């Protein structure tokens, strides 16, 4: 089995989301804030959550070496939310995104996790153009994106989604992105 990178911050572990996280993902995907701001994914059982992880997370992880990370609090190993780098259909470039269970919002976890994922995306995965999308009424997400250094660019629509979304962008200097670390895809190591 290929081993993918995990990350760590002062309070958090960021581990690639796997089928072991299916029960947690079921809860997150059906939380009121996920439904309101991201949308109903029609995942209603642990089995459907495992299938969602296989098709949306594992497939991208195998293809690119990064995807969705389950955010775990170090002190008690509780799963708080997710943060990741996504290759979304209809969006050129890599999208940084995050979602937390309502009881773990407004505690700085999303910013802490997203700063580390942003750093890893730039320094370890060589991402030179990072984007983010959010709905117009998700002001908390917009503020967090601005704290990450992303700037509002324009309104966009994604395929199969009639809602206009706010697009935020961050262009990374190519030299800075590759100067500190060169990422080697796990499958290229023999």
State where each predicted segment sits.
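Hydrophobic residues in alpha-helical segments
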Residues: 29, 38, 60-62
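Polar/charged alpha-helical tracts
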Residues: 55, 59, 159-160
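Acyl-donor (CoA/ACP) binding surface of acyl/acetyltransferases
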Residues: 1-36, 68-190
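Conserved GNAT-fold acetyl-CoA-binding loop/helix
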Residues: 35-55
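A short helix-loop-beta-strand connector motif used in the catalytic cores of GNAT acetyltransferases and
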Residues: 57-70
């Amino acid at each position: 089995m290929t081993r993918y990178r995990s990350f760590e911050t002062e309070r958090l572990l960021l581990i690639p989301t796997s089928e072991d996280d299916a029960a947690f993902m079921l809860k997150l995907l059906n939380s009121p804030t996920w439904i309101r701001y991201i949308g109903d994914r029609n995942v209603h059982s642990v089995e459907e959550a495992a299938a969602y992880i296989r098709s949306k997370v594992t497939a991208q992880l195998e293809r690119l070496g990064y995807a969705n990370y389950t955010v775990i609090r170090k002190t008690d190993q509780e799963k708080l939310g997710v943060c990741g780098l996504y290759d979304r259909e209809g969006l050129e470039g890599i999208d940084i995104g995050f979602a937390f269970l309502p009881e773990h919002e407004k505690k700085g976890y999303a910013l802490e996790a997203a700063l580390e994922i942003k750093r890893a995306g730039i320094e370890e995965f060589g991402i030179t153009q990072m984007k983010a999308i959010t709905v117009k009424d998700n002001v908390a997400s917009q503020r967090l994106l601005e704290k990450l250094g992303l700037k509002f660019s324009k309104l966009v629509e994604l395929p199969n989604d009639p809602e206009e979304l706010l697009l935020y962008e961050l262009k990374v200097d190519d030299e800075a992105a590759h100067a500190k670390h060169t990422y080697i895809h796990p499958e290229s190591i023999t």
